[in-house]
Amino acid sequence: KDLGLFNEAIESYEWAISYGPKYAIAHINLASIYSSYDLEKALHHYQEAISIEPNFPEAHYSLGTVLSSLGQKDESMKSYEKALELRSDYVEAHNALSTIKKYKKNDPQIKQMKNLLKQTNLMLSDKISLNFALAKVSEDLENHKDFFKFLNEGNHLNKEKLNYSIDSDLEGISNIRNIFINSKGGAPKSNLKKGMPRPIFIVGMPRSGTSLVEQIISSHTEVYGAGELDFLSRSILKEIHTEVYGAGELDFLSKNVLKEIKPDNIKKIDSKEFFEKITNNYYRSLSSFNISEDIFTDKMPLNFRFIGFILSAFPEAKIVHLKRDPIATCWSIYKHYFKSNGNGYASNFDDLSSYYLMYKGLMDFWHKTFPNQIYDISYEDLTLSQEKETRKLLNYCDLSWDDRCLNFHKNTRAVHTTSGFQVREKMYQGSSEAWRKYEQYLEPLISKIGDAK
């Protein structure tokens, strides 16, 4: 599973269940794979686990995450609450519930979370989760001082946990440019074989509107919305690591491949074969989705790093790039809990502003290298002129008009991001101005990227 070999993992778990149908953990592990692309099967296996062990809090919590992805807010809350009823110190359930619940002053859960945070033996990850949850509580109660107290502490601890260094990301991006420049020119004209769906890659900074645009495009009858896939970065990093070091598949997962690449190593990369392997690896992972539509979306925002590789390995691909007000984007990133090191820059304003400026510089590079091959769409323009911008977007994607794309909020597909419930609502305006009421707290960010349009 960790290698992206989902079909093989599914076979292993199904084999375990065939020999022990009352093995709750196997049902949960199988459901965790299906939750990425087949929620009906995920629901089935989580419910099976609960029927086997009804007092299994982790199963109720996991069921809640699937229900949340399906937009079933009330049912999701009930599952999280059941998990907390069974285990009141279940911090992940507290945090998950906080993201979808609107708090009032005397909610007993608030006291529970504050008491948990006082414990001296609390794991670092639990401290982070509780600080972000209590920040959300403070935001709901409009207590700005406590909001920033908990938010700043949560981000500070998260940076400590991830041991993140912005220099590592900046060096990695520099190496991406060099690898691409060295390998450019050897790409095949087309790697798309008969029966393969054509990709639309939706990229940009997190919290810039990528989930909204995927929801719009995937509402079209010819499009399958695959969500945030890590297949591309896995494929690229695996092949870079293999070309340079010749090591097996497991090694690249434990290394910062992009940072470790040296200029002399880059020259080892054989362009044509390199891009063909990226394509083949990507579609091998994608095969577990059993996509019947002709087109699919991949909306991993940070794929903006690899646009040159995408257009070389997938010449038929469309690239949709979301642009949003820089302060609105970075503020929204800062107030959300990102657990992976890939978003480690989110944890303080200095790193966040440096990363944003790096992103902007890299996008300028891709635009110059691939003129007229990257479609920029403004989040603000989309919210102000929904139909006009949707028509332009579909036209770029070579899709005919479909009224369902205007009624994207009725789309029942799974959404696994923090924007999951927002994209099930009608288009609304003004979210890019929400940061202004916290302006006094955001001066370090504003001074660095306020003019980075």
Q: Where are the language model's segments positioned?
A:
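Conserved phosphate-donor/acceptor-positioning beta-strand/loop module used by diverse small-molecule
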Residues: 310-333
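Structural signature of tandem alpha-helical TPR/SEL1-like repeats
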Residues: 2-15, 25, 35-48, 69-82, ...
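Short beta-strand segments
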Residues: 95, 202-204, 215, 295-301, ...
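Conserved alpha-helical positions within TPR/SEL1-like repeat arrays
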Residues: 1-2, 25-35, 58-65, 92-99
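PAPS-dependent sulfotransferases, especially Golgi type II membrane carbohydrate sulfotransferases
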Residues: 98, 110-121, 125, 131-199, ...
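Phosphate-binding active sites in nucleotide-utilizing proteins
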Residues: 190-239, 245-312, 322
